Amino acid sequence: MINAVLKTPALSSWTEKANFFGARKLPFVFLIDFEAGNAEIFTFHEALEKGIRWSFPDGHRSVPVPQHPPAIQLEKYPISLEEYDQKFQQVMSALQYGDSFLTNLTVSTPIKTNLGLLDIYRFANAPFKVYWPDKFVVFSPERFVKIQSGKIYTYPMKGTIKDEKGAEQLLSNIKEQEEKATVVDLMRNDLAMNSRDVQVERFRYAEAIQTDRGKIWQTSSKISGRLPSFFHEKIGSIIASMLPAGSISGAPKKRTVEIIQESEGEPRGWYTGVCGYYDGADLDSAVMIRFIEKTDKGLVFRSGGGITAKSTADQEYQEMIDKIYVPVY
């Protein structure tokens, strides 16, 4: 494995299997959790037998997407600002000591909705969707890595603002600019481990995301590199070396992951892991954000954002709440 931050038996086994499939150009579906304690690889048939469903923006989906969604009802019960601030201050302490330049802090929020996980999967408007029965549903706006025609691309997403404030304010925000620069540099280095001619094709651009309560804006970047001709036989190693995704961890990655585990106080599990498919030629994948998990106590929505030395607890708390939405409209 190439310079991997995460080194677990599950990820090592997954990497070997993915390289085996890639060398033979055999299609597969994959899911890897944030801590890499669980790493699954299935043939398309095996995934469907388990009830796993997926939909990606190039039209690759397991089942047709229905029209005419029902009206959604969504209630959320976030932790208090005081509780959030305790976690926030742990992160800020690490930032002030110089242990991290950027740390992604997330929390769990109990929710109630009139729709089940499969309904949300079927009707959510999102480029990347995955449903795993009795586990979770993902409706992610963020691509992780795309491999196409011998090139590798990544599109880190950072920065969120409500529509009424507009994309211009998001793009001009100094804190958001610095956060984006840190993530872009991190992901550029990740690509450079496996490819050459790495370049930032688009540094920062705003995209609107429609929710059940109006629009929010987020900024993304586009970074690319050229893979060696034998990349298929190393496709598992390439993905594993870039985990966890930089946009949902931080920099420097190894120490920041430790800070995340200390401050959040619970494993993320599948949330902020990665999922994707390989069709024998190309690969596409997503970061598993916008995530609803089924637990013994009901449904839980996981959300958060990037913390820098210029962050404030009240703004980050509000961003965490703003990201609790279901794009059914």
Regions found by a protein language model. Give the residues of each.
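Extended alpha-helical targeting/anchoring segments
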Residues: M1-Y329
